[in-house]
């Protein structure tokens, strides 16, 4: 027995050593034009990148780790990367519009990855998409095991039906976000009661909810809204995904490192309202908290002091702020009700003035971030163009002044010449008049003598 265990350990060590000796390029394949024809035979996880893209370079070591993780797990998924600037026709075929773009390709389906760019999240996404759309739960033990691993669980209960066809259709659309399962009624926990079968359930927040077509509307919309827990730790990626739900996002903005009563109180109040007022607010609001105000400030183009509470409308960029600090759940409920009845004043928006403000705010933020990260680079990037523009303006102004002075000098010369010519003419006329006067005088004197 000990010998068998030793052999097993040696086998693992040898296989790990062998894998470690394999270059990363063998685990992450560089793709070319042939990929277009050969891809349908396998499941692919592909990174579409551009050589000049900074985010692509940052993703590269993570992508290599993804290749190693998937290969060591024995997954059938093949990991590759393709230069979208060289093979632009392939990038266009898959609708690549930005870099990096991560896609899972399975048959004729292409799934976009929009989550955090970490090894764990990318691998989890790839394995979810590569597996079956609907995963069966044959026993209660399997159900309990899966429920512990997934905070949100969608389960179809029943035999073949129109509802199951819709469930499969929704799964093919939303498998990029969550898992979908099927089970018989006897596999479910004892506390679950169903009025009718077939049914679709979601297990989350230590309870379950049953889909009601009459109250909840379209199954796809219901799944899209229910795929989040009732209270979340919200970051930029989560907030982006919450935009698809159509809900307002109620966020307690705090500093998680600050254990003062002000920070812990606003978070606990938000949790309390989310849990105890689900029936009133769940359809319209998603509750959560955000660590730090940097992201929220850039989103709102404002400087929020923390701790605070803000409600975001991601569809039109509007937001709502309470008129005073919230001290208890009753005040938070009152504030949320004022949003529902339209008495709360909305700020922000996506109008023309706000778009212009966004342009200037983004420009300011870019300049500040560059100077903070590298003052010398900032001086070079912004000082050099300003210097060139200043020299050009000075040259233009100086040229105008010199031209004006030269023009005035020419005018003065012309005026002086004209004045001199006028004086000469007057002097000549004077001489002529004098000559004429002398002749007249002589003639007059002659006539007087003749008379005498």
UniProtKB/Swiss-Prot annotation:
Q: Which residues lie on this side of the membrane: Lumenal?
A: 27-375
Which branch of life, at top level?
Eukaryota
Transmembrane region positions?
376-396
Which PROSITE patterns does the UniProt entry name for this protein? THIOREDOXIN_1, THIOREDOXIN_2
Cytoplasmic compartment spans: 397-452
Entry keyword Lipid metabolism: no
InterPro entries (alphabetical)? PDI_TMX3 (IPR052250), Thioredoxin-like_sf (IPR036249), Thioredoxin_CS (IPR017937), Thioredoxin_domain (IPR013766)
**What GO molecular function terms would the record report?**
protein disulfide isomerase activity
**Entry's EC annotation:** 5.3.4.1
Q: Name one GO cellular component term.
A: endoplasmic reticulum membrane
Catalytic reactions on record:
Catalyzes the rearrangement of -S-S- bonds in proteins
The signal sequence is 1-26
Q: State a single Pfam family of this protein.
A: Thioredoxin_6
Q: What residues form the catalytic site here?
A: 53, 56
**Di-lysine motif, short sequence motif: residues:** 449-452
Kindly list the places in or outside the cell where this protein is found, as annotated in its UniProt entry: Endoplasmic reticulum membrane
Q: Give each disulfide bond as a residue pair.
A: 53-56
Topology in membrane: Single-pass membrane protein
UniProtKB keywords: Disulfide bond, Endoplasmic reticulum, Glycoprotein, Isomerase, Membrane, Redox-active center, Signal, Transmembrane, Transmembrane helix
Q: Name the glycosylated positions.
A: 258, 313
| Stated role | Probable disulfide isomerase, which participates in the folding of proteins containing disulfide bonds. May act as a dithiol oxidase. Acts as a regulator of endoplasmic reticulum-mitochondria contact sites via its ability to regulate redox signals.
Member of which family? Belongs to the protein disulfide isomerase family.
Q: Print the domain comment field.
A: The di-lysine motif confers endoplasmic reticulum localization for type I membrane proteins.
Name recorded for this polypeptide: Protein disulfide-isomerase TMX3
Naturally occurring in which organism (per UniProt) = Xenopus laevis (African clawed frog)
Q: What is the lineage of its organism?
A: Eukaryota, Metazoa, Chordata, Craniata, Vertebrata
